[in-house]
């Protein structure tokens, strides 16, 4: 199915010259002079090579048809990451290349969307928000309330996020998986 380049989003799968690529990032640029362009960073599914492309925003790109289904994360071992389809209980092993940087979000039982093409896993869509626990934060400096001040914090999964001053070690927070930003204090 042909789509215009400006409509490409992270996780989309495109077909270029018979090869499939997963979109990692897509940004639209509108220079003051000249034609608007879409800068797309992609990963070739066959060998994991990262590629950068630049298209005019109105240019047509072939979007591949993929099967997308819900899976639950089970565990990780030397083979890869194991997921189970909750209805049929079919299990699938996904390579670390496909999981990518999202591995830090995976927790046992987490529901994700797994995209497949010809029964081969090509990309994973994680929930937009996940709950993590803070292991350590820097102390708050009194008197810095004139502007919104955030402080760095380390999470149990190894991520560093910026959090408001009232968040301390042991607090569970919700973060956005796309930009690793603090959303709110967990309500549990």
From Swiss-Prot:
KW Cytoplasm (keyword) present: yes
Record-annotated disulphide pairs: none
SUPFAM superfamilies: Nucleic acid-binding proteins, Translation proteins SH3-like domain
Pfam families (UniProt xref): EFP, EFP_N, Elong-fact-P_C
GO cellular component, one term: cytoplasm
Pathway: Protein biosynthesis; polypeptide chain elongation
Functional summary from the UniProt entry: Involved in peptide bond synthesis. Stimulates efficient translation and peptide-bond synthesis on native or reconstituted 70S ribosomes in vitro. Probably functions indirectly by altering the affinity of the ribosome for aminoacyl-tRNA, thus increasing their reactivity as acceptors for peptidyl transferase.
NCBIfam families hit by this protein: efp, PRK00529.1
Similarity-based family: Belongs to the elongation factor P family.
Designated name of the protein: Elongation factor P
């Amino acid at each position: 199915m042909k789509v215009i380049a400006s409509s490409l989003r992270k996780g989309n799968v495109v077909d270029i010259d018979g090869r499939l690529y997963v979109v990692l990032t897509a940004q639209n640029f509108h220079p003051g002079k000249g034609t608007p362009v879409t800068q797309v960073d992609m990963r070739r599914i066959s060998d994991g090579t990262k590629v950068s492309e630049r298209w005019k925003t109105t240019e047509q790109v072939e979007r591949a048809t993929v099967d997308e289904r819900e899976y639950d994360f089970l565990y990780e071992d030397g083979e890869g990451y194991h997921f189970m389809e909750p209805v049929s209980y079919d299990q699938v092993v996904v390579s670390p290349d496909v999981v990518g940087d999202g591995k830090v979000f995976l927790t046992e039982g987490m529901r994700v969307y797994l995209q497949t093409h010809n029964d081969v896993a090509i990309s994973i869509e994680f929930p937009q928000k996940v709950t993590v626990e803070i292991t350590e934060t820097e102390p708050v400096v009194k008197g810095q309330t004139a502007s919104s001040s955030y402080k760095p914090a380390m999470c149990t999964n190894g991520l560093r996020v910026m959090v408001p001053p009232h968040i301390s070690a042991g607090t569970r927070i919700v973060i956005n998986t796309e930009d690793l930003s603090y959303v709110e204090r967990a309500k549990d």
